[in-house]
């Protein structure tokens, strides 16, 4: 299955989420479960998505001491998720140990992806936490570190895709939030791009939330987005 669309579930209740999920098709998208929904609904919710044949990106952005992160990544693998992420700013050792713990899973291991710079952050935001670099510079730095650790790819804004292809190669997966279909509200993400533009720059997977989940006819929107990037 070569779905490029990952739908970010942003519902407050299980019933709302399942109502949406039952309107869409696992052949058209994968699903992202983040901190809010996982904290509220837990592993049982992920299993329900698997029962409906959806691949799941468990977006918990682990960032802790290496042993703790590695064990959390192993738990995600045991849950059967398709992709899981951690913060590259946790360091090389943390990422290496997380990757190593997945070795026994072989081809069944989830993709391990690093978060570089959150798409809501700009130069001033980085400066305020002691990083005297532009978002692009920091993304490149952390992406190199993730590749060195053996990770499968990174989360990055669409504007960084072309540069990262040059730095990290074609086999390095680029997962891009900040995707808004033409005419959509930008919401809380500042570095945005349309699905067609993002794919044309070389993105592998597109994370899209509210333009699909809050649509009156989500299946129609999802089909239209897929058609635009075909």
From Swiss-Prot:
Q: What is its EC number?
A: 4.1.1.23
The protein's annotated catalytic reaction(s) are: orotidine 5'-phosphate + H(+) = UMP + CO2
Annotated pathway, please? Pyrimidine metabolism; UMP biosynthesis via de novo pathway; UMP from orotate: step 2/2
User: What's the protein called, per UniProt?
Assistant: Orotidine 5'-phosphate decarboxylase
Q: Please give the HAMAP family that the UniProt record associates with this protein.
A: OMPdecase_type1_B (MF_01200_B)
Q: Which PROSITE patterns match?
A: OMPDECASE (PS00156)
Q: What does this protein do?
A: Catalyzes the decarboxylation of orotidine 5'-monophosphate (OMP) to uridine 5'-monophosphate (UMP).
The record places the active site at 61 (proton donor)
Q: Which CDD domains match?
A: OMP_decarboxylase_like
Q: What SMART domains does its record include?
A: OMPdecase
**Subunit and partners:** Homodimer.
Q: Name one GO biological process term.
A: 'de novo' UMP biosynthetic process
GO cellular component term, pick one = cytosol
Q: Which UniProt keywords apply?
A: Decarboxylase, Lyase, Pyrimidine biosynthesis
Q: Which family does it belong to?
A: Belongs to the OMP decarboxylase family. Type 1 subfamily.
Query: Which lineage?
Result: Bacteria, Pseudomonadati, Pseudomonadota, Gammaproteobacteria, Pasteurellales
Q: Which PANTHER family match?
A: OROTIDINE 5'-PHOSPHATE DECARBOXYLASE (PTHR32119:SF2)
Q: What class of enzyme is it?
A: lyase
Q: Which GO terms describe its molecular function?
A: orotidine-5'-phosphate decarboxylase activity
Residue positions binding substrate: 10, 32, 59-68, 119, 180, 189, 209-210
């Amino acid at each position: 299955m070569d779905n490029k669309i990952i739908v970010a579930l942003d519902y407050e209740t299980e019933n709302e989420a399942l109502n949406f999920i039952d309107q869409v098709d696992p052949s058209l998208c994968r699903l992202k479960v983040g901190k809010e929904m996982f904290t509220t609904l837990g592993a049982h919710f992920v299993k329900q998505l698997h029962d409906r044949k959806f691949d799941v990106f468990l977006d918990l952005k682990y960032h802790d001491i290496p042993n703790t992160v590695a064990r959390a990544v192993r738990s995600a693998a045991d849950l059967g998720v398709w992709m899981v992420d951690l913060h590259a700013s946790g360091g090389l050792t943390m990422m290496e140990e997380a990757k190593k713990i997945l070795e026994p899973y072989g081809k069944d291991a989830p993709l391990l992806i690093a978060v570089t710079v959150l798409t809501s952050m700009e130069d001033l935001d980085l400066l305020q936490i002691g990083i005297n670099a532009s978002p692009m510079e920091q993304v490149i730095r952390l992406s190199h570190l993730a590749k060195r650790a053996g990770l499968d790819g990174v989360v990055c804004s669409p504007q960084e895709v072309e540069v990262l292809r040059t730095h990290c190669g074609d086999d390095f997966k680029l997962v891009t939030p900040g995707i808004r279909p033409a005419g959509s509200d930008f919401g809380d993400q500042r570095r945005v791009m349309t699905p067609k533009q993002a794919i044309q720059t070389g993105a592998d997977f597109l994370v899209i939330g509210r333009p699909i989940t809050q649509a009156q006819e989500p299946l129609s929107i999802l089909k239209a987005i897929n058609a635009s990037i075909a």
